Each structure stands twice: as C-alpha cells, then as structure tokens.
C-alpha cells in the first residue's frame, strides 16, 4: 500500500515537472483536437501541424534550456535515460495522463543538432483521406489517382 502511494506521488510530481516545462503555450496546443503535432526546431521556433491545414509557425520561441528541460522531463516520465556520448536523442512514448492522451516523442540534442529540438505526435482524432493528403501537399493528384 505504501509503495503504491509513493509511486502515485512520484508519478504526479513527474507530471507537474512536465507540465511546467512545457508551459502554457504548448499545453494549449496539446489540448486542441485539430493539432496533431507540436514541434520545436533547433532555432527555437514552435511549430504545430493542424489537421486539414498543415504546418504553422506559432510565432512562439523557446530557448534551448527550456527545450532541454522538456526533453529530460519526458525521458524521466517515460522511464528512459539519455546518454549524450552514445546517442544524444530520445524516442519515447508519453503515457496517457491527466495532461493529455498518449503521444509519441522524438528529440535530438547537441551532438546531432546545433540546439535541442523535439516533436510530439498526438494520435489524431480524425482520419486522413487521400484527398486530405493531396490538399496538404503530402501527395500529388497523380499519386492519388494511381492509388
């Protein structure tokens, strides 16, 4: 019983750290159903991929230290470690929680990139049609017709 209580306390603390690290801007996009991906590039630009619209520069910038805090918070939450000398990257599944449903996470740190960067891929609540891919420019009309 005491171990379960301790585990819940540790889990909740890790969620609090992640929520604080992500900040209000990213949490806002994580709660939007039409946003399927949130990413921070090495230049610090925060981009989103919106269903049916495509990629948008949000105009928000994250400094490298904050980006790194997000990466390490997700490593901790997902039970992963990052060895900068061996592989300065992280691939993780973010478990479902009170913050948001489960997501996929990919991050790169200096050694692979100039500054920390990451992508959070949410599970889409919508189903993409082939026509959606053509509209977004991910597929040509000729490719659509061939399929």
Residue positions per predicted region:
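Generic hydrophobic alpha-helical segments
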Residues: 26, 146-147
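N-terminal anchoring/assembly modules that precede and organize ATP-driven motor systems
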Residues: 1-57
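P-loop NTP-binding catalytic core
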Residues: 49, 55-146
């Amino acid at each position: 019983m005491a171990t379960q209580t301790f585990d819940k306390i540790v889990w909740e603390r890790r969620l609090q750290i992640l929520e604080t690290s992500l900040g209000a801007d990213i949490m806002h996009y994580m709660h939007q159903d039409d946003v399927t991906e949130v990413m921070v590039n090495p230049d610090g630009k925060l981009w989103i991929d919106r269903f049916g619209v495509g990629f948008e520069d949000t105009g928000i910038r994250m400094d490298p230290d904050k980006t790194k805090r997000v990466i390490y918070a997700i490593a901790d939450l997902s039970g992963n470690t990052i060895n900068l000398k061996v592989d300065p990257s992280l691939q993780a599944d973010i478990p479902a929680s009170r913050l948001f449903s489960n997501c996929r996470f990919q991050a790169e740190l200096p050694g692979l990139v100039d500054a920390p960067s990451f992508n959070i891929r949410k599970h889409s609540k919508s189903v993409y049609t082939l026509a959606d891919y053509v509209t977004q420019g991910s597929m040509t009309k000729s490719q659509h017709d061939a399929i």
